[in-house]
């Protein structure tokens, strides 16, 4: 009996030690263009295959419809959650064509809390949002914050920089809880909004990994950033080689969350 007890104690100790080590997190950001591909077809199963192909833990989705006529009145977050076996969270920002339009998150882990924050909006009927979830990591590792967003596309837009400031102000209230923000920022790495975010967050790739236009990408406007920098190691960031399912390419970051 003492031998069994010793082995159990050893296994428990090893488990506790493992839980204190780095923890891998795979994040995907994907502007899905409401599921409409370059062939003009709305095909959520095709979008789901792109997502499933990299087996992410957290997914930030932009340009997502729910109950909208143009996409067959489908609840796209729910459908993608079912297809990918992930928990869907939807942040509706605009009433459109009989339904709602906004950002969504898919999560492998339980969602403890969610909030949809409004960002600055200078254009009628084009409210922008920042969707936030707090997920509970396994093995007692604590909470992780994940944000999905889509910032205005217009050149010299008056919205983008204030939106970035709002994101930074929000994370300043979170007391250093590890966080990731991912989305279509509609700016290259040297754009004012991305530079503003980088005062607080760390981009998961240096230089530029082009994500748009989808057929022959020439610029990176989709980004993944982490906070605080000391809690994260970037293992890999890459753009997925898929050019039909949407008008953007998806970007994947493989990260390690370090012990506090």
Predicted features along the sequence, with ranges:
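N-terminal, active-site-proximal structural segment of metallo-dependent hydrolase catalytic domains
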Residues: 2-3, 11-83, 90, 95-103, ...
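Beta-strand-turn-beta hairpins that frame and shape the catalytic cleft
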Residues: 19-27, 99-101, 107-113, 125-148, ...
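Active-site beta-strand/loop signature of hydrolases that rely on acidic residues for catalysis
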Residues: 24-32, 47-73, 106, 133, ...
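Surface-exposed cleft-lining segments at the edges of enzyme active sites
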Residues: 34-36, 116-121, 149-157
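Short, solvent-exposed loop/turn segments at secondary-structure junctions
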Residues: 35, 95, 111, 151-153, ...
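Active site of divalent-metal-dependent phosphoester/diester hydrolases
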Residues: 40, 68-73, 86-105, 124-127, ...
């Amino acid at each position: 009996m003492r031998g069994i007890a010793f082995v159990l104690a050893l296994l428990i100790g090893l488990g506790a030690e493992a839980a204190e080590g780095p923890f891998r997190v795979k994040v995907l950001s994907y502007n899905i263009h409401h599921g409409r591909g370059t062939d003009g077809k709305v095909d959520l199963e095709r979008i789901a295959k792109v997502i499933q192909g990299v087996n992410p833990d957290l997914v930030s989705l932009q340009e997502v419809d729910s109950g909208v006529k143009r996409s067959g009145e489908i609840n796209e977050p729910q459908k993608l959650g079912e297809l990918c076996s992930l928990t869907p969270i939807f942040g509706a920002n605009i009433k459109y064509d009989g339904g709602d339009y906004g950002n969504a998150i898919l999560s492998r882990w339980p969602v403890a809390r969610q909030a949809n924050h409004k960002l600055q909006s200078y254009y009628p009927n084009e409210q922008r949002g920042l969707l936030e979830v707090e997920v509970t990591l396994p093995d007692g590792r604590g909470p992780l914050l994940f944000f999905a967003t889509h910032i205005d596309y217009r050149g010299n837009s008056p919205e983008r920089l204030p939106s970035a400031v709002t994101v930074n102000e929000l994370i300043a209230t979170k007391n250093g809880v590890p966080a990731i923000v991912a989305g279509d920022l509609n700016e290259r790495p040297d754009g004012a909004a991305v530079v503003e975010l980088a005062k607080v967050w760390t981009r998961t790739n240096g230089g530029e990994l082009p994500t748009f236009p989808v057929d022959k990408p020439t610029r990176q406007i989709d980004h993944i950033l982490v906070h605080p920098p000391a809690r994260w190691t970037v293992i890999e960031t890459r753009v997925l080689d898929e050019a039909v399912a949407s008008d953007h390419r998806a970007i994947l970051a493989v990260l390690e969350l370090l012990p506090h």
